[in-house]
Amino acid sequence: MSTDITALQHQALVYDSLDEYVVRAAAFLREGLEHGDGAVVAHTRAGIAVMREALGADADAVRFVDVGEAYTRPAHTLAAYHDVYADQLHRTPSLRAVADVQFGPDPGEWDLWTAYEAVFNESFAHLPARVLCTYDGSRLPERILDAVWRTHPTVLTEDGARTSDCYEEPDQVLRRIATPSAPLPQLRSIGFGRDAEEFRERLAREMNLAGTPAGRSLDMLLAATEVAANAVTHGGGIRDVRAGSAGGRFACEIVDAGPGFDDPLAGYLAPRAGSGSGLWIARQLTWSLEFFHGPRGFTAQILL
C-alpha cells in the first residue's frame, strides 16, 4: 500500500556533510519504496553515484536525474521535473523525490532560482508527491539558506519536521525579489511589421547581426512569436518591438498597446485544460521573461 500522499508536500533539508545527506535521503526514499511510492533522485553525477551505492539493490527502483542537465534555466527545470514526475506517476499512485538544489556560482542568478523554488509550490500543488529539496549548508551563503525557509512550508531539522514561520506564498516571493524592470537602452526599435512572418524576419536579422547561434536563434523566434501572439490575442496589439544585445545576451522587448496584466506566475505554470501554453513555452526556451509597465506601454522583456 502506498503512503497517504494526496497533494504536494514540499520540504527542505539543510545538511552539513555528505554523510548526513546520504543517511537522511536514503531513509526518506526507502520509507517510500516500502509503501509502494515511486522514487526520484536528482543530484550531480558524483552525488548520484554515492546514492546508488548507499541504496544498494533499492537503486534499481529509483529514477535518477542529472542536475547538470536539468538545472539550466528555471522554467526548463520545472518542465523537466513535470515530465519525470508524470512518468513516475503513471507507474505508482504517489512518489517521493530528493532533489539537491543547485543555485550556481553567480549571485546575479540566485533570485531566479529562489523564484523557481517558490513557483514549485504552485506548479506541483496537485501532485501526490513528497519532494525533499536538499541544500549543502557547509558551502551555501546565508542569502540562499534564508530563502529555504521562505520557499518551503516544512523544513527537516535534527528535531524532526518543522513548519516554517517564514514561508511565503509563491506570488509574494516573486514580488519581493523582483528587481525594478525598465527598457534596455542598448536595444533598437525594429517594429513588428505587417504580420508575424515579417516580425520573425526582422528579429532573425537582428540575431544574425548579433552573432546568435542558429539553434538559440530558433528558440528566441519561437518564444517571441508566442509572446507576440499573446499580446495580439489577449492584449491590445503590438505597439513596438525592440531588439539587440544587452549584457552578453540577446534581448527582445515587445510593447503591448493594451493595459497589460499583473500576474508574477504568468508562464511558470504548466498549461491545463482550457488554458494557453504560449508563455509556458516562451519561458522554457529563454533565460528569462519579465513583464512591466514601461514608458511606451506594457512590455514583455525576453532574454535569451
Regions found by a protein language model. Give the residues of each.
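Non-catalytic sensory/regulatory segments that transmit input signals in bacterial signaling proteins
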Residues: M1-A196
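Conserved short strand/loop->alpha-helix "switch" segment adjacent to the catalytic nucleotide/phosphoryl-transfer site
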Residues: E197-E226
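Coiled-coil dimerization/phosphotransfer module
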Residues: P183-Q186, L218-G235, P264-L269
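Hydrophobic pocket-lining residues that define ligand/cofactor binding sites across diverse proteins
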Residues: G32, M207, A231
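Conserved beta-strand-loop-beta-strand hairpin that lines the nucleotide-binding pocket
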Residues: V232-L304
